[in-house]
Amino acid sequence: MNPPRRVALVTGGSRGIGRAVASTLAEQGWTVAFTWREREEEARRVAEELGDRGRPFRFDLRDRARAGDLVREVEEQVGPIAGLVNNAGVRRDGLLATLADDAWDDLIDANLGGVFRCCRAAVPRMLHRRQGSIVNVSSMTAVHGLGGQAAYGAAKAGILGLTRSLAREVGSRGVRVNAVIPGFVPTEMVADVPPDRVKALRSAEALPAGVTTTGVAGAIAFLLSDAAASITGQTLVVDAGLLA
């Protein structure tokens, strides 16, 4: 069991998978600092649900200077970060042949650069304390191509490479780094996916119940926990058998 008051930082924790992660970790005794970008009222409701186990912080993945300040503020106001969940992301579809450079750069910078900057801010502190666990949330598009998601898939595949290399860099000093690939999870982020594509994805799943936000959150909580103390540099797929 995790000791009380262990602190986790969850980016994108006000909705979808991130919200489920924040709730699951709080139930397991973690104190959760979670980030939000646009919807302050939504973040406030999550904080109320978590009670003294939750603290909201505003954060935009695209703000290159903000990650360092965020980590510093969390450690000063909440406590030393023992777990980092890089969950926040930006999805926008576009065919490669017509994708503008700015759109490509934005998706790569937000989805891969944001993870890089959060890791860069948190890792030195974890190394100093010789403990910490990082879970980076990727996507099935990293390993299973989907038309219109070349930039998004490239960024999410980059997260897997970052995860493996960083695990090698920091493992000798007690810090673990893993990734999770969620399958098709019915959240607001994928609300605009065409019904025929949703049907095709769901029909490819081996488990009829599909994937839920709480199911993904449980996998992330496991990787953060002491039960996963011997696991690093790995990718855990939570997809109801879609990629099997």
For each predicted feature, which ranges?
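Residue(s) in the substrate-gating loop at a strand-loop-helix junction
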Residues: 139
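Conserved glycine-rich cofactor-binding loop
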Residues: 14-15
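C-terminal substrate-recognition "lid" of short-chain dehydrogenase/reductases
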Residues: 116, 210-238, 243
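Substrate-binding pocket helix/loop in short-chain dehydrogenase/reductase
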Residues: 95-96, 103-108, 190, 201
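Alpha-helical segment proximal to the catalytic Tyr-Lys
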Residues: 124, 168-172, 229
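Conserved glycine-rich Rossmann-like NAD(P)H-binding loop of the short-chain dehydrogenase/reductase
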Residues: 28-44
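Active-site helix of classical SDR
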Residues: 119, 155, 163
